[in-house]
Amino acid sequence: MNLEARSKQFLAAPIAIFVSCSLFLIPAKSQEKPRLKVVELDTHGKDYLQVLAGPPESVTMKSGLEVLAPNQSVGKHSTGQHEELLVVLEGRGVMTFDDGSKLDVKANHALYCPPETEHNVTNTGSNVLRYVYVVASTK
């Protein structure tokens, strides 16, 4: 078999595999369209309120309202394969990262965390810290 014939044979296999695999991906796109939703941001004395729970309420977004008492922290966690946005409604605190860096958290500020970022939010003020977080999948 000459070089040109072997090249064509070699290229045919990956193309056939790609076509075959792409057929399995088609049904995953049949998710029902999410509906409009309004959520009152009142925790009724609780420290957490789920705003969006992910599919089928949204395409990839999850969201919640956190309320931290003075000196309370949400706990160290990673964004994983998600982006995260925090919108601070009330209070002040600090967001700490594994590398030792810190960001001030205060009312009327929004903070963005990229994927694969370990962080923690702690209330450093004398009143409650209230913020809404929104996470969206990057995959």
Placement of each model-derived feature along the sequence:
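Short strand-connecting beta-turns/loops that link adjacent beta-strands
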Residues: 56-58, 81, 100, 126-127, ...
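Bacterial N-terminal signal peptides that target proteins for export
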Residues: 2-15
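Histidine-centered divalent metal-coordination motifs
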Residues: 77-79, 119
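Extracytoplasmic
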Residues: 60-63, 83, 116
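A short, N-terminal "cap"/entry segment at the start of jelly-roll beta-barrel domains
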Residues: 18-62, 70, 75-76, 96, ...
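A short beta-strand-loop-beta hairpin characteristic of the jelly-roll/cupin
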Residues: 73, 83-107
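Ligand-binding loop in jelly-roll beta-barrel domains
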Residues: 115-139
